[in-house]
Amino acid sequence: MGSVLSSDSGKSAPPSATPRALERRGDPELPVTSFDCAVCLEVLHQPVRTRCGHVFCRSCIATSLKNNKWTCPYCRAYLPSEGVPATDVAKRMKSEYKNCAECDTLVCLGEMRAHIRTCQKYIDKYGPLQELGETAARCVCPFCQRELDEDSLLDHCITHHRSERRPVFCPLCRLIPDENPSSFSGSLIRHLQVSHTLFYDDFIDFNIIEEALIRRVLDRSLLEYVNQSNAT
């Protein structure tokens, strides 16, 4: 991985880092077990893993890619997209706790960004926390031509266009350089869920997924045993 979850995480942050990040820039190397984003140097928020294996906040990597011609801010590898949800990291953050560096309150890492938004000591020292790229990209719904934030498109389609079967182009694919905005007939919602929903942990119960995987392995083992028994 290439946030501070990477073993080579001692590189400095880009100029867009937050005030607190600028203060930390002299640190020799952040630990491998840290859950800090290598762009803003705050605790990861909605972590995303890029194709080159690095992990960043979703808003940080989105802004960085648009400002740096679609290259990884850490290793400069070309990235065709923001990446995929780092669900393993998000899951670990829900069970890890850390004291706020300013007020010393013990906070779950998954809630740390929400905490420092209201932490008066943090605000007094650095000002209100500003996420990179807080203004979401805009797109047009291909069914009704309504202008929406990209984050709102999926919910909008599920609410208003679930029964639509007209072939349409994906408006989010059009925002990505070199991406082919394929035409979808009756499956745009599924495409958005698979390709453009970065926070599966908001919609999926990890325990259910783990149980399903265990059942699948057991079923496969039983099937192999039966096949071997029949063969003999």
From Swiss-Prot:
Keywords: Adaptive immunity, Golgi apparatus, Immunity, Lipoprotein, Membrane, Metal-binding, Myristate, Transferase, Ubl conjugation, Ubl conjugation pathway, Zinc, Zinc-finger
Chain positions recorded as Zn(2+) 1 binding sites: C37, C40, C57, C60
Enzyme class: transferase
ZnF RING-type: positions: 37-76
UniProt key word Lipoprotein: yes
Zinc finger (C2HC RNF-type): 100-119
GO biological process entries: adaptive immune response; negative regulation of RIG-I signaling pathway; negative regulation of type I interferon production; protein polyubiquitination; ubiquitin-dependent protein catabolic process
Residues covered by region (Interaction with the C2HC RNF-type zinc finger): 43-45
Keyword set includes Zinc: yes
Free-text description of this protein's post-translational modifications in UniProt: Autoubiquitinated, leading to its subsequent proteasomal degradation.
Highest rank taxon of the organism: Eukaryota
Membrane association type: Lipid-anchor
Region entry Disordered, spans: 1-27
Chain intervals for the UniProt region annotation (Interaction with the RING-type zinc finger): 109-113
Subcellular location(s) per record: Golgi apparatus membrane
Sequence segments annotated as region (Required for interaction with ubiquitin and for autoubiquitination): 210-224
Subunit structure: Interacts with UBE2D1. Interacts with VCP/p97; leading to recruit RNF125 to RIGI and promote ubiquitination of RIGI.
Purpose: E3 ubiquitin-protein ligase that mediates ubiquitination and subsequent proteasomal degradation of target proteins, such as RIGI, MAVS/IPS1, IFIH1/MDA5, JAK1 and p53/TP53. Acts as a negative regulator of type I interferon production by mediating ubiquitination of RIGI at 'Lys-181', leading to RIGI degradation. Mediates ubiquitination and subsequent degradation of p53/TP53. Mediates ubiquitination and subsequent degradation of JAK1. Acts as a positive regulator of T-cell activation.
Name of this chain's protein: E3 ubiquitin-protein ligase RNF125
Species this protein is from: Macaca fascicularis
